[in-house]
From Swiss-Prot:
GTP binds at residues 17-24, 88-92, 142-145. PROSITE patterns: G_TR_1, G_TR_2. NCBIfam families: EF-G, PRK12740.1-5, small_GTP. SUPFAM superfamilies: EF-G C-terminal domain-like, P-loop containing nucleoside triphosphate hydrolases, Ribosomal protein S5 domain 2-like, Translation proteins. Its main location: cytoplasm. The gene is fusA. This is Elongation factor G. Belongs to the TRAFAC class translation factor GTPase superfamily. Classic translation factor GTPase family. EF-G/EF-2 subfamily. Keywords: Cytoplasm, Elongation factor, GTP-binding, Nucleotide-binding, Protein biosynthesis. GO terms for molecular function: GTP binding; GTPase activity; guanosine tetraphosphate binding; translation elongation factor activity. Residues 8-290 form the tr-type G domain.
Length: 700
């Protein structure tokens, strides 16, 4: 089957923005103008096509990136048909994992900004992710019809807050209620869309008289940006010659692909103005799969390999999202980097080292799907029937195995206990949590050995709320949520010698007798955690009872004498004791050992250890004082600061118990413009006042 669209006419793009910049509405308009969707879905009616999970429609926010395919030939049908694969990405900070994951598989991105709110905090996080993966991008300043809309202010913020070399491609005609259309600064013509057919048709008109001067000024700014692409064009420009439209567009495209500039378009998706011209910009300025460097990977022999966007190379694809579909089970979204694969073919999962069979392959439009026979280099599609494929796995030709760059996923930062409301929910909850963890690598589940509770961990409070909500809706599991928990540990600080433990019951008949003498000493935290040394000389204690002594002490380690937390980093030396021919038994020596251990532990300067997190906060410079002040109140040790042009990174070590609710506090301190990450670092001694309070609470 031949390729229907040449790969040079593919555009794999993400639409990315802060919550409420109007990103989902923008995507809806793309689907409408490209002829995919006949009735425009409005977010504020809860009917948007891309937001297909129930919680998304209720909360009006996008949680899962739905991938969809559309075709576009230009506003005036001026191009051959291009295939645009659109990935809609979430804009909430608890879902950055989804954004990060889709950045991996995109070739270009459209950053949507609100003309009133401008560059918001999450836009800064998304921007950093796009930089990390060198994604060429253009900007769309949306909501030009809103009160307070100001296009040039947003362009300025792109420069100052993000350090972007922002170059307007258009200027708005009017703003707020008076927003009429845009001026195309390359053609120097006004574009007015027809309101009667929801903007499907438009006219090129002369630039309004009161805008001629400002348009000239920004037209020159655009030409200058184009001329900087090569010495040849620069000479032509400085020599006073006019550049042709082709030269201008070619030069701008070259600079966008090199991520040297970001072209800025504008409009109001809600009012059906501007998205059409932004689609033209996607085709004209964003890369096709062949414009970006070959993807790197690791061959079977650990050498570096790569795959070019070419049908003739061996098949290689990256699974970037797993979604559970109510009708077909798991859908694995994947991006094909090279080669061709047909439905029914067997491929190799090089990360798990297993073979997988592609059952059916579907192309998604939001959550409707169309079955296709094959996919080729550059395609984005979803497979049904893959058994054991996780996010970030590589699917490839069995005869040419390669592992494409692995994605790095952040460690979860918050944990809570969940318990099913009824016995019937118990088993269903296990299945539901397993499914959700497979879909979302930033969500983890484990059973706490000490309490037996099921603990779920994720990227923030909203993240876990939504997980619990999905358990309820999709899997019909009712669960109660506990308070966030911290795991403490206990240990000793000084050595104690010759501590005795005796268990004797000898009041006639078969008695019980065990007697041990031990030393207790601290071990290095990097060491084994526990050691038992038997130094019994002669037969003061017969050899068969020695393991019972060790076992008696190990049982005590599970729940320490201070507050019932696990005991770590200590050693025991057994060096004396006595026994009775008739009354001694394993049980008696186990009990004697536990008596000796408790007595020794109490004298060995016992302390409580608390988990310390390594925390990194990235904040605009103006909030550094507030952020550090707040961290100090949380008993943080700030270990360093590092400033870039637009943000300051603060590194600190903070006790986990002080970090609950931090995401919310940090948002309010910095108007939501800071982001943070944290990971477990070490255990260290809790200050006396903190330890006393914890011990007191546990004893109640």
């Amino acid at each position: 089957m031949a390729r229907t669209t040449p790969i040079e006419r593919y555009r794999n793009i993400g639409i990315s923005a802060h919550i409420d910049a109007g990103k989902t509405t923008t995507t809806e308009r793309i689907l409408f103008y490209t002829g995919v969707s006949h009735k425009i879905g409005e977010v504020h009616d809860g009917a948007a096509t891309m937001d297909w999970m129930e919680q998304e429609q209720e909360r009006g926010i996008t949680i899962t990136s739905a991938a969809t395919t559309a075709f576009w030939s230009g506003m005036s049908q001026q191009f051959p048909q291009h295939r645009i694969n659109v990935i809609d990405t979430p804009g909430h900070v608890d879902f950055t994992i989804e954004v990060e994951r889709s950045m991996r598989v995109l070739d270009g991105a459209v950053m949507v900004y609100c003309a009133v709110g401008g560059v918001q905090p999450q836009s800064e996080t998304v921007w950093r992710q796009a930089n990390k993966y060198h994604v060429p991008r253009i900007a769309f300043v949306n909501k030009m019809d809103r009160t307070g809309a100001n296009f040039l202010r947003v362009v300025e913020q792109l420069k100052t807050r993000l350090g972007a070399n922002a170059v307007p491609l258009q200027l708005p005609i009017g703003a707020e209620d008076n927003f009429k259309g845009v001026v195309d600064l390359v053609k120097m013509k006004a574009i007015n869309w027809n309101e009667e057919d929801q903007g499907m048709t438009f006219n090129y008109d002369d630039i309004p008289a009161d805008m001629v001067d400002i348009c000239e000024e920004w037209h020159n700014n655009l030409i200058e940006a184009a001329a900087e692409s090569s010495e040849e064009l620069m000479e032509k420009y400085l020599g006073g010659e006019d550049l042709t439209e082709e030269e201008i567009k070619g030069a701008l495209r070259q600079r966008v692909l090199a991520t040297e500039i970001i072209l800025v378009t504008c409009g109001s998706a809600f009012k059906n103005k501007g998205v059409q011209a932004m689609l033209d910009a996607v085709v004209e300025y964003l890369p096709s799969p062949t414009d970006i460097p070959a993807i790197k990977g690791i061959n079977e022999d650990e050498t570096e390999g790569e795959r070019h966007a070419n049908d003739d190379e061996p098949f290689a694809a990256l699974a970037f999202k797993i979604a559970t579909d109510p009708f077909v089970g798991n859908l694995t979204f994947f991006r094909v980097y090279s080669g061709i694969v047909e439905s029914g073919a067997t491929v190799y999962n090089s990360v798990k080292q297993k073979r997988e069979r592609f059952g059916r392959i579907v192309q998604m439009h939001a959550n409707k799907r169309e079955e296709i026979k094959e996919v080729r280099a550059g395609d984005i599609a979803a497979a049904i029937g893959l058994k054991d494929v996780g996010t970030g796995d590589t699917l490839c030709d069995q005869n040419a195995p390669i592992i494409l760059e692995r994605m790095e996923f952040p460690e979860p930062v918050i944990s809570v206990a969940v318990e099913p409301k009824t016995k019937a929910d118990q088993e269903k909850m296990g299945i539901a949590l397993g499914r959700l963890a497979q879909e979302d690598p930033s969500f983890r589940v484990h059973t706490d050995e000490e309490s037996g509770e099921t603990i779920i961990s994720g990227m923030g409070e909203l993240h876990l709320d939504i997980i619990v909500d999905r358990m309820k809706r999709e899997f019909k599991v009712e669960a109660n949520i506990g308070k966030p928990q911290v795991s403490y540990r206990e240990t000793i600080r000084t050595r104690v010698n010759d501590i005795e433990g005796k268990h004797a019951k000898q009041s006639g008949g078969r008695g019980q007798y065990g007697h041990v003498v031990i030393d207790l000493y601290p071990l290095d935290p990097e060491g084994p955690g526990y050691e038992f040394v038997n130094e019994i000389k002669g037969v003061v204690i017969p050899g068969e009872y020695i393991p019972a002594v060790d076992k008696g002490i190990q049982e005590q380690l599970k729940s320490g004498p201070l507050a019932g937390y696990p005991v770590v980093d200590l050693g025991v030396r057994l060096h004396f004791g006595s026994y009775h021919d008739v009354d001694s038994s394993e049980l008696a020596f186990k009990l004697a050992a536990s008596i000796a251990f408790k007595a020794a532990f109490a004298k060995a300067n016992p302390v409580l250890l608390e988990p310390i997190m390594k925390v990194e906060v990235e904040t605009p410079p103006e909030y550094v004082g507030d952020v550090i002040g707040d961290l100090s109140r949380r008993r943080a040790m700030v270990s360093g600061q590092e400033a870039t042009d637009f943000a300051v990174k603060i590194n600190a070590e903070v006790p986990l118990s002080e970090m609950f609710g931090y995401a919310t506090d940090l948002r309010s301190q910095t108007q939501g413009r800071a982001s943070y990450s944290m990971e477990p670092l070490k255990y260290s001694e809790a200050p006396k006042n903190v330890a006393d309070a914890i011990i007191e609470a546990r004893r109640k």
